[in-house]
Amino acid sequence: MIIVKDNFCEDVEELRKLALSQDYIMHRYFPGGSVAWRGFRTWELTYLNNPLIQKYAEKILNLAYETYNLKDQALHKFFHISYEEHKQNRIREWHTDPTSHAGVLYLTPNPSSESGTTIFLDGKRNDIKNKYNRLVMYPGKNKHGISSFFGDSKESGRMTFTFFISDREKFKRDLSELNKLRERHDHGYSNRYFKF
């Protein structure tokens, strides 16, 4: 089942401002090998300990619990920005995630509506349109990907709050590994961060 919820955040402008203020790393510089995503992504956002991020992480988890009958899950969360130019850097158009569920919250005002998320469910292609403050959530095992890209700057690019839901033990292991990568990366490659 695919969840689509419009007007998800009461204070979406504050969340967008927070996203614009973060450091990002480009896909080609992400440590640990090749990644399926293209563009710029923050490190996992738990380390910020930000009340706004925690508020929406809890809201997303509660929606997942109610809809998918999940228990004892945790949420990996990132801000992600991609530009029109990133469509040429795609290794694979569609992918799956090794998590129970995944999703995005669109954070670009007045986006290209065709730049949403394509999700394959029961053999059928579903093109969910990009709309500011729209949440989309789906099972991670279903093939999915960005429908199309747009923009060429932090203000005009395709911005999302991207999340992955998994059981708490997997979350702890994954977060520990991500933090180790971040610490190693911070010591030797801080010049590869993309600061707007």
Residue ranges and their predicted role:
Residues 2-81, 88-91:
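Non-heme Fe(II)/2-oxoglutarate
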Residues 1-17, 23, 28-33, 166-196:
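Peripheral, non-catalytic segments flanking oxidoreductase cores
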Residues 82-196:
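Catalytic core of non-heme Fe(II) oxygenases with the double-stranded beta-helix
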